[in-house]
Regions:
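Secretory/organelle targeting and membrane-embedding segments
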Residues: 1-146, 151-398
């Protein structure tokens, strides 16, 4: 059965993207907005205001947006909607650390429209942006601010950042998001777990041998060396994307499908995590290959100890998962780009087919990228004569 996207109409809005010329905006935010526009979800009276330090005007920024869409949404740029979409793009040059440009931004954000401010910038600027939005009366009590990772470097810095933001915005105005949760197959994981009696009775350590969560990237740091060398794979990927996936896999059924109920169950998983031993962690850096730079060369830091690859074994001490290991791994410059979750079930307690039948396990494999989908590996008899020979075949559940 093919997945169907249902369009939920939204009201007119002004979306202000701080860091509007950055990598995240060009690769993810702007292409996503254009996809929603083509799908009919973004109204014609909604506007996207790119904000950055670059010396651009609205026309040159629109050209930048078109270039980004050609690179990251090549199949859609030929559509007739592109010309209409581009007219809804504006640009304001500002300096987050001075008063330059803020009055111009205040004049462009409509007071009668829904307002969202996307902080696609370094977390060190979050507090200053919140202060400026308040100082120039740009944001209102109904405005939202959207924050991507990383949210602080550690617990104390995250708490300090929360305190600064809450000086100007209430908790229900602050959206700390993880874009991995927007993937169709990630959302489908909730439906598979809690919408089917088939899986939930088996979703525990009695039947599941182990679970693997893999996010492999074929690219290197790609111009993000200064940021990445401060963060590393652990902070860049494990503590946000992979931990979110771990929580969705391991959490108990929430009382209802609501943000607060789901969050509460995720928190229980995190509290049940065992401390991770150094013997259960593997860290590494990619080396050079031909004309391609090594990690140390890419970040221009020969003495860097920052990991570009990390794998760890995680244990959850509760009744459902005690004894079942979770393996999390992510890295750059790996053989192929692949993000998937593999739920590997235990072997049958006894094989009636004898030792020649081999070892077989069922596995539920959820692919997040590049090709979203879900398969269930089943053991069946190999067709044809020659006795009972067993093979594993994937059942496509997409």
């Amino acid at each position: 059965m093919k997945m169907v996207s249902r369009v939920i109409p939204v009201q007119a809005f002004d979306l202000v993207v701080f860091g509007g010329t950055g990598d995240l905006a060009k690769r993810k935010i702007l292409p996503s907005l254009f996809r929603r526009f083509v799908a009919g979800q973004m109204p014609n009276d909604a506007f996207v205001i790119g904000v950055a330090r670059s010396e651009l005007n609205t026309k040159s920024y629109q050209d930048l947006v078109i270039s980004a869409l050609k690179e990251f949404e090549p199949e859609l740029v030929a559509s007739a909607e592109l010309e209409i979409f581009i007219k809804q793009i504006k640009y304001v040059q500002i300096d987050a650390q001075s008063d330059f440009g803020w009055s111009d931004l205040a004049s462009k954000v409509r007071k009668n429209a829904i307002q969202a401010f996307y902080f696609s910038v370094s977390p060190s600027l979050f507090g200053q942006l919140a202060e400026k939005l308040h100082q120039y009366s740009i944001a209102s009590q109904s405005s939202r601010i959207v924050l991507e990772k990383p949210f602080g470097r550690d617990l104390s810095s995250a708490q300090a950042l929360n305190a600064v933001l809450k000086e100007h915005f209430s908790e229900d105005q602050i959206y700390r998001i993880d874009h991995y949760l927007g993937k169709e197959t990630v959302q489908n994981l909730m439906a598979v777990r809690f919408g089917n009696m088939l899986f939930e009775p088996l979703w525990n350590s009695q039947y599941i041998d182990h679970i693997q969560v893999t996010v492999a990237e074929s690219v290197g740091v790609e111009g993000r060396g200064s940021y990445y060398d401060q963060a590393g794979a652990m902070r860049d990927m494990i503590q946000n994307h992979l931990m979110q996936l771990l929580c969705l896999i391991a959490m108990e059924p929430p009382a209802k499908f609501s943000p607060d109920a789901v969050r509460d169950e995720k928190l229980k998983v995190i509290r049940a995590l065992d401390p991770i031993s150094s013997s259960d962690i593997v860290r590494g850096q990619y080396s050079n290959s031909g004309s391609e730079k090594s990690y140390l060369e890419a970040v221009d830091n020969p003495s860097s100890k920052t990991e570009s690859f990390i794998a760890l074994k995680v244990q959850i001490s509760n009744w459902r998962w005690a004894g079942t290991p979770f393996y999390l791994r992510t890295g750059k410059k790996l053989k192929a780009r692949c993000s998937e979750i593999a739920v590997v079930f235990k072997e049958t307690p006894h094989s009636i087919f004898g030792p020649d039948a081999g070892s077989h396990r069922n596995a539920l494999v959820i692919r997040l990228q590049p090709d979203e989908g879900m398969t269930m590996d089943l053991t069946i008899k190999e067709p044809g004569p020659g006795g009972m020979r067993l093979i594993d075949v994937p059942l496509d559940m997409t």
